Amino acid sequence: MEERKTIYLCLAHMSESNMEQKYVKEAFDTNWVVPMGPNVNAFEQNLADFANNNSDGSKLNRKVVCLSAGTAAVHLALIACGVQPSDEVCVQSFTFCASSHPITYLGAKPVFIDSERETWNMDPELLEKAILDRKEKTGKYPKVIIPVALYGMPYDCGKIMAIANTYKIPP
């Protein structure tokens, strides 16, 4: 019998500076919990500044928006990728429902990809098999791939990006 190996889940923690508590208190003290407020506005601007610096020194014109939930972010990303009711979207099977609900909100079909033993995240080999299976059965590739970094464990970004690039599917 194979020996089981424990996978430790990453628990939420504060940074060493504990600045998170300061900003949460400031948001409540100034009543800027909803809508967004100056901290979120500053974060959006700082992230846009960072995202718009091209490696060659030129400036890009990328837009940044903070959303209230990951579900909203996935939903917006799927819309931006042009997902339509007839499309299929690859998503890992072991995740929170927020990863697949936006797919069904748009009338598309989730294609669930099983996980690796080591990380519990999307298995790149099974992803590629599913992509080829969907192409054979439907005549087209899935429209998008939604990998998830579960419990603080990163998915194999290099392998998943290579597969996405091979089949020209946005991750």
Predicted regions and their residues:
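Hydrophobic pocket-lining residues within nucleotide cofactor-binding pockets
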Residues: 14, 115, 150
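Flexible loop residues that form catalytic
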Residues: 69, 94, 150
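Residues at alpha-helix caps and immediate loop-helix transition turns in enzyme cores, especially N-
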Residues: 20, 39, 102, 123, ...
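Conserved PLP-anchoring active-site segment centered on the Schiff-base-forming lysine
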Residues: 75-129, 133, 140
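Active-site phosphate-binding strand-loop segment of PLP-dependent enzymes
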Residues: 118-171
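Conserved PLP-binding active-site segment in aminotransferase class I/II-type PLP enzymes
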Residues: 1-80, 84, 106, 128, ...
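Proline-centered loop/turn at the N-terminus of a beta-strand
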Residues: 63, 88, 109, 143-144, ...
